[in-house]
Amino acid sequence: MYKKVRVVLENGDVFEGVMLPPTQFSDSDIVVLKLKNGYNVGFKKGRIKEIVELGEVQTAPLSAKPMPKIEGEKVWLLATGGTILSRVDYVTGGVYPTLSVDYLFEVLGGLEAPIEAEEVTAKFSEDMTPALWGVIAERVAEAFKKGARGVVVLHGTDTMQYTAAALAFAFKSAPGPIALVGAQRSSDRPSTDAVLNLKAAIAVTARAPFAESVVVMHKTSGDTVVAVHRGTRVRKMHTSRRDTFQSINTTPIAEYYPEKELLQVLTDVYKERGGLDYTAKFEEAVALVKFYPGMHPRLLEALLEVGMKGVVIEGTGFGHVGEGVLPAVKKLIDAGVIVAMTSQTLYGRVNLYVYRRGRELLSMGVIPLEDMLPETAYAKMSWALANFKREEVPRVLTTPIAYEMSPRSDPLVFGGL
């Protein structure tokens, strides 16, 4: 039960809404209202002249008309966390996660394919682990075994690029696309991007000719087009913008235009729909380390002490580290740890032949990973160590498997151009 109130401030401003209960993170000196437009607003108690109770409200039960029968092959929705499938009661401010396909049909304005929805886990994306990548991969495979035309994975955006890359390596071939989708704006905000992103992801899995791991999110800050990025070539580039996800060193594989309900494939180079062939194991003893000026070598040596089997370094420029950590890098390699190099610049590619420092790293046994993104390299290292013998891993890392690296850099794609 919640209270609807009128808050009168000392300066004469008046607000009406539902008073939200405090949480463990709330400031005890703040009163929070859920306004009619869906936004929350907070007031310091010292600014409030009067609070007038206007009545009580109850949580509205979830209801939706039964979805009509839809013909065709099913699309599976696998929920892993995040707010994209949450329903918000604008009266009480309560958030209700729902996997009801009837409700989905209603909020999306229809579905172009029959839907099955399941929950895999309920995790903040920062709590994802390589072990959970394996769990998600197994559930994706189960969906395909049940006849799914495609699988939509609902995922928090902060680490979506890691999971997308992991699934790209896990599935050598698949009967359909694996589309990861999320929302930058939670569904209790008028500017939410959840509905359009999900609608686009379902369209991709139902219609696309390719069968790859992709990220489906807004291409622009408006609602005119949604981009479909390769899972190994995408990165979250802004903390809050709707168009935060960008393809790096390449362009999106497809675009979805909601006004025309048009899915436009932008390349003829892709993995086609086929049989199911996957390996869902990932090694947890892998580290991703960013080099910085003044880095203490003990930080790298500590990775050996905790049993790391693989280390991906984000080096400067062409893929360099400071002279002071070279002995630590050599110590890791001499102990049998696989060490690979990516670049902090993201765009461009690692080249350890240009400067002496790069050649020193090569002579130690550091593996240059061309134009592979650091997060993608981390996922590939985890997958390779879990599924191949140690002596095979360097070859696997430098062999293109899921379009994660290219033979040349296209200057026209720098900065998303």
Swiss-Prot record:
Heterodimer of GatD and GatE. It catalyses: L-glutamyl-tRNA(Gln) + L-glutamine + ATP + H2O = L-glutaminyl-tRNA(Gln) + L-glutamate + ADP + phosphate + H(+). Its EC number is 6.3.5.-. Gene3D superfamilies: 2.30.30.520, 3.40.50.40, L-asparaginase, N-terminal domain. The active site is at 83, 157, 158, 236. GO terms for molecular function: asparaginase activity; ATP binding; glutaminyl-tRNA synthase (glutamine-hydrolyzing) activity. PROSITE patterns: ASN_GLN_ASE_2, ASN_GLN_ASE_3. It comes from the Archaea. It comes from Pyrobaculum aerophilum (strain ATCC 51768 / DSM 7523 / JCM 9630 / CIP 104966 / NBRC 100827 / IM2). One of its GO terms (biological process) is amino acid metabolic process. Allows the formation of correctly charged Gln-tRNA(Gln) through the transamidation of misacylated Glu-tRNA(Gln) in organisms which lack glutaminyl-tRNA synthetase. The reaction takes place in the presence of glutamine and ATP through an activated gamma-phospho-Glu-tRNA(Gln). The GatDE system is specific for glutamate and does not act on aspartate. Residues 73-400 form the Asparaginase/glutaminase domain. Keywords: ATP-binding, Ligase, Nucleotide-binding, Protein biosynthesis. PANTHER family: 60 KDA LYSOPHOSPHOLIPASE, L-ASPARAGINASE. This is Glutamyl-tRNA(Gln) amidotransferase subunit D.
